[in-house]
């Protein structure tokens, strides 16, 4: 619904650049607290999101850790240059590396509950989601990386 939601093309050559640019664009549009949420986290609730916005009043960064070592949510109340765009993603040390960088910058951080995000077929099982495919190869084509 174009009257209710604004849509924007993501800009950047990789995930980190796209996330960083999203924050830059939103702050340029005069938003004062911004939260990015991954679309592959089925257990996220409105209470978690509300808690994130609440904690941004007290902290520089909020992070929702994912069980696989990444994160499903990140929020800021001001842009932090190159926090997200100069790093690699898709490995189990993503969260730890980001938290190290946040600490090096002397930023305060609040961690939301750890949740599962869906990256591979086993993640569906862990989340209690069952999807039946006629052909097992259809999983990779339709859901997998």
Where are these regions (language model features)?
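Conserved alpha/beta core of the MobA/IspD/sugar-nucleotide pyrophosphorylase nucleotidyltransferase superfamily
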Residues: 96, 100-145
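Short acidic donor-binding/metal-coordinating loop in glycosyltransferase active sites
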Residues: 39-41
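Short aromatic-hydrophobic micro-motifs that form the base-stacking/packing surface
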Residues: 35-37
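Short phosphate-binding loop-to-helix
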Residues: 2-33, 91-94
């Amino acid at each position: 619904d174009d009257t209710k939601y604004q849509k924007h093309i993501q800009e950047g050559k990789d995930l980190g650049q796209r996330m960083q640019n999203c924050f830059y664009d939103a702050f340029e549009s005069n938003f004062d607290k911004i939260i990015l949420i991954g679309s592959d986290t089925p257990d996220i609730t409105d209470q978690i999101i509300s808690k994130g916005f609440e904690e941004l009043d007290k902290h520089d960064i909020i992070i929702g850790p994912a069980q696989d070592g990444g994160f499903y949510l990140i929020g800021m109340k001001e842009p932090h240059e190159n926090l997200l765009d100069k790093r690699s993603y898709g490995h189990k040390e993503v969260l730890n590396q980001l938290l190290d960088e946040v600490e090096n910058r002397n930023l305060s951080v609040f961690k939301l509950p750890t949740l599962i995000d869906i990256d591979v077929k086993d993640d569906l099982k862990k989340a209690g989601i069952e999807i039946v495919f006629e052909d097992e190869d259809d999983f990779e084509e339709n859901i997998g990386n």
